[in-house]
């Protein structure tokens, strides 16, 4: 197995696809996706374009659809939910399909949609995703962070490092043999440094600061938890995720 880490979807190679691609947007899209599916949502369908989301969701029964829209950390006017995992209560999402568009995370999922195996990971479901990857043993794995509008993010990199660290622990080999690029080694180092204080890292990050300024400290605390959900969101058709 070779693991390649890319900090943003813009950094992903255009001329080849891995056997497995994992999208990461810890604050907050992939955390919300995992939480919604764990709470009983039927599926999450992602869109980069809000207009397309509205058109497609109109074809779904109103009682069974939830429109999730976020731009700049804020809920989009007229949508049912913003991009907060705290809104994904079982009584609200059970049996429903979430139609979701966010500033960053949904772009990552769209960028890797052609890969044979597409997963969504966050810290909350880190072990579940890593065990799923370990079981399937893909030869090449991409971990694709979402960043913020094309720029690097600490929180996605530390989550990539958490995944790599877990997978590395299942291998009888040095990290260099698992790493496909230097970013994989750097992400692992970041996680090893902050693994016992992830919330502090989130407070240092630019997007963490952005969410704090919007009054979303509870989301940061939730998203900083590790291995609390035994859920693996995987793509069953382009841009449509259910639990594996």
Curated annotation (Swiss-Prot):
Q: List the PANTHER family.
A: 2-PHOSPHOSULFOLACTATE PHOSPHATASE-RELATED (PTHR37311:SF1)
Name the cofactor(s) required for activity, per the record. Mg(2+)
Q: Pfam families attached here?
A: 2-ph_phosp
**Name recorded for this polypeptide:** Probable 2-phosphosulfolactate phosphatase
The family assignment reads: Belongs to the ComB family.
EC no. given is 3.1.3.71
User: Catalytic activity annotated for this protein?
Assistant: (2R)-O-phospho-3-sulfolactate + H2O = (2R)-3-sulfolactate + phosphate
> Per its UniProt record, what InterPro entries does this chain match?
ComB-like, ComB-like_sf
Reading the lineage from the top rank, the first entry is Bacteria
A GO molecular function held by the record: sulfopyruvate decarboxylase activity
Keywords, alphabetical: Hydrolase, Magnesium
């Amino acid at each position: 197995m070779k693991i390649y880490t890319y900090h943003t979807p813009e950094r992903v190679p255009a001329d080849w696809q891995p056997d497995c691609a994992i999208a990461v947007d810890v604050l907050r899209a992939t955390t919300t996706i995992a939480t919604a599916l764990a709470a009983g949502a039927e599926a999450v369908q992602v869109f980069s374009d809000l207009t397309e989301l509205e058109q497609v969701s109109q074809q779904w029964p109103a009682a069974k659809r939830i429109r999730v829209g976020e731009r700049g950390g804020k809920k989009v006017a007229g949508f049912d939910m913003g991009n907060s995992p705290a809104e994904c209560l079982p009584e609200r999402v059970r049996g429903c399909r979430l139609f979701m568009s966010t500033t960053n995370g949904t772009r990552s999922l769209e960028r890797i949609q052609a890969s044979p195996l597409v997963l969504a990971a966050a810290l909350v479901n880190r072990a579940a995703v890593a065990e799923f990857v370990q079981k399937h043993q893909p030869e090449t794995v991409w971990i694709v962070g979402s960043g913020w509008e094309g720029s690097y993010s600490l929180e996605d990199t530390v989550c990539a490092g958490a995944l790599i660290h877990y997978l590395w622990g299942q291998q009888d080999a040095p990290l260099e043999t698992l790493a496909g690029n230097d970013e994989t080694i750097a992400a692992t180092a970041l996680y090893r440094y902050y693994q016992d204080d992830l919330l502090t890292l989130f407070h240092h990050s630019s997007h963490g600061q952005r969410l704090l300024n919007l009054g979303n400290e509870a989301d940061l605390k939730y998203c900083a938890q590790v291995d609390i959900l035994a859920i693996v969101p995987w793509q069953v058709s382009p841009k449509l995720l259910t639990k594996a």
